[in-house]
Structures are given as structure tokens and as C-alpha cells.
């Protein structure tokens, strides 16, 4: 009984998420839920899919949200199945242009990706672009002329807020984040890369209460995004 009581007084969760605003909002929602618990041992880390898998398989993380192209689904499905990881779909989407609400791209429909070359592309500093670095170069458009790598999300949003000619490729976002930074998501007919966000975790029957709570909040935030 004393062990059970100690567990009830301690919330422990280790989760990996991609650079996704809705996922970080879910993490904050979770922290609000558990803020009154006596002890908190929470680790929230952002990174790519392979890093996330490594943290779940080898470093004791409980949950990992993977983000990958739809055409890579079979690879990740087989990879997770061989390693005893359960997969839970969260969201399918296509990237949109994220830009200043009053900027030229907010009013322009991009029919050819070369039209973006005169604007400034903001990228996550650790983002690996499909097709880049020796790949076929087809799966992702890269603005080779005007690129700025930024590692921190708030800095990226501040740049987009201050510079109307800057843009990012972004996944669906919470409406309140768009309003806070005076940004807009614009669908781009020229960019049709389909993506998946899939939650993975060790298949041990049932999730712990902490994990269940986070998963519920993640689904809730995903449903509230602007696509």
C-alpha cells in the first residue's frame, strides 16, 4: 500500500515530440493537469523520428510522436512491429505555408514552387529535408537561395511576425497560436507532400494513467488545429 500511495503522489512521464505546436500545447495541458501532484518527474524532448524511436527503445521514454512522409509508412510500421512498439495514428496532413497574416504570401496562391525563391524560408535547425543531401531532390522543395535555420520555435514565430516576406512549411496549428503571432496557414497546391503523425510506445497491454492522460490531451489538441 505504501508503494501504491507513493506512486499516486508522483507523476512520471518521458515523451518525445516533433517540432509541432499542437504537441507542445498538449504537453502544457498535461503539466496543468498534474501540477498539484506532490512529485513530478517529467521529460519533454523535441526531435526527429529516428531519435524519438531511440529514446523509446533504449533510453526509457514512455511515448514518442513520430512524423514521417506517407510513403514511408510501411518502413516505420515494420520497424515498430519488429521491436514490439504499438502505433496509434494521431493526424494525417499536408504541409501548408505559414506566413505573416499581412504579408504577400497570405494573399498569393503558389502554383510553382520556384515562386518562393524570392522570399525567405525559415527552417528548424535540425530538420532533415527528404530528398536533400544526395537524395532524389523530388520529395521536398528547398529554397537554396534564401534559407534561415532557426532552432527555437518562438524565435521562428517572431521572425515570421516581424518579416512579412518570410515563410515556413508548417503542420496544422492551434488557432490561438496563429492569432497570438499574427500568422496564417495557406494551402499550397504546388506542395503536396502528405505526412503522418503517429504515436508509438512499448506494447505492454495497457498504458499507465500518466500516459493515457497525455494521449487523450494530444488527440484533443490535434482535433483543434487549423488545417
Name every feature range the model reports, one short phrase each.
Residues 57-62, 126-185:
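Hydrophobic hinge/microswitch elements
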Residues 82-88, 93, 154-206:
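Beta-alpha-beta core module
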Residues 1-8:
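Alpha-helical "hinge/linker" immediately C-terminal to small N-terminal DNA-binding modules
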Residues 24-29, 73, 112-142:
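Secondary-structure junction motif
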Residues 8-54:
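N-terminal winged-helix
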Residues 79-121:
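Flexible hinge/capping segments at coil-to-helix
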Residues 26, 206-218:
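Short amphipathic alpha-helical coupling segments at ligand-binding clamshell hinges
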Amino acid at each position: 500500500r505504501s508503494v501504491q500511495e507513493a506512486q499516486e503522489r508522483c507523476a512520471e512521464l518521458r515523451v518525445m515530440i516533433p517540432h509541432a505546436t499542437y504537441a507542445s500545447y498538449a504537453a502544457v495541458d498535461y503539466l496543468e493537469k498534474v501540477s498539484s501532484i506532490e512529485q513530478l518527474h517529467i521529460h519533454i524532448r523535441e526531435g526527429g523520428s529516428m531519435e524519438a524511436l531511440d529514446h523509446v527503445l533504449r533510453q526509457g521514454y514512455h511515448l514518442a510522436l513520430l512524423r514521417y512522409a506517407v510513403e514511408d509508412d510501411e518502413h516505420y510500421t515494420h520497424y515498430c512491429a519488429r521491436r514490439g512498439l504499438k502505433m496509434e495514428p494521431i493526424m494525417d496532413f499536408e504541409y501548408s505555408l505559414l506566413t505573416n497574416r499581412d504579408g504577400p504570401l497570405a494573399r498569393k496562391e503558389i502554383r510553382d514552387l520556384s515562386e518562393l525563391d524570392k522570399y525567405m524560408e525559415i527552417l528548424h535547425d535540425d530538420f532533415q529535408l527528404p530528398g536533400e543531401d544526395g537524395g532524389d531532390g523530388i520529395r521536398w522543395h528547398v529554397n537554396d537561395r534564401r534559407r534561415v535555420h532557426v532552432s527555437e520555435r518562438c524565435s521562428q514565430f517572431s521572425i515570421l511576425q516581424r518579416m512579412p516576406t518570410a515563410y515556413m512549411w508548417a503542420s496544422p496549428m492551434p488557432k490561438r497560436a496563429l492569432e497570438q503571432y499574427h500568422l496564417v496557414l495557406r494551402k499550397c497546391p504546388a506542395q503536396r507532400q502528405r505526412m503522418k503523425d503517429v504515436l508509438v510506445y512499448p506494447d505492454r497491454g495497457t498504458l499507465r494513467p500518466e500516459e493515457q492522460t497525455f494521449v487523450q490531451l494530444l488527440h484533443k489538441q490535434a482535433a483543434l488545429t487549423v488545417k
